[in-house]
Amino acid sequence: RLGLVGLAMSASAVVGLNLPSLAQTDIYDSDGLNIIGGVESRYQLSYRLANNTRRNSRANYLMEVKGDKVDAAVSKLIVTIPEAFTRYSGRINMDRIKVHYGRISNLGDEIVIDEVLWDDRVFSGAQDLSEDLDRIEIFLTEDIPANTSFTIEFDRVRNPNRALMQRVNLQVLPRGEELATYVGTWEMLIAYQD
C-alpha cells in the first residue's frame, strides 16, 4: 500500500498539476502593468527605416499614421523621442522634417509645415518608462483632415553610435484645442542594421 501511495505522489510531483496560479492569471488577464513590455497592439504604429546603420548621417525614418487613428482634423504633431537617442550622438535634422498625405507604400503630396520646434528634456508622463524625452513639435499650415492617413518623414538623420530600441510617441493637437491626444507609438530598433 505504501508503495502505491508513494508511486502516486511521485507521479503527481513529476507531472505536476496544470493549474495556473493566481499570479499567472493576473498577468494574462490584466489590462494593467505589462511585465514583459511593449506597446498595446492598438497603439502600435508602422514605420520604415533606411540606411539604418550606426553613425550613418543619411538615415531616413518614415513613420506612418493610419487614418482610423485620428478622428479629428489635426493642426499640430508632437513627436517624443527618449533622450538616449541624443545622448548617444543621434541627431535629427530639423530642416529635413516633412509630412506627407498617404501611407508609406504610397506617399502623397507634402503637407506644408509652418514651424518645427525642438524641446529637450520633457517629462513623459505615461506610455514610456523614461522620464526624459526630447519633443519635436510640428506646426502645420493646413489641417490634416480627420480619418486621413499621413506619414512623418525624418530625412538626413544622424543615427546614434550604438543600437537602441526606442519608443517614439505621437500626440496630435486639433486646431483650437489645448490638450494633445496620444495616437500611438513607433517601437523602432535604430542603428541596428549591419
How would you describe each model-predicted region?
Residues R1-L7:
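Bacterial N-terminal signal peptides that target proteins for export
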Residues L22-D128, P160, L164-R167:
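N-terminal secretory signal peptides
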Residues E64-K66, T80, E137-F139, E153, ...:
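Generic structural detector for well-ordered beta-strands
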Residues K66-D68, P82, T141, D155-V157, ...:
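Solvent-exposed residues in well-ordered beta-strands and their adjoining turns
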Residues E137-N161:
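Low-complexity, intrinsically disordered segments enriched in Ser/Thr together with acidic residues
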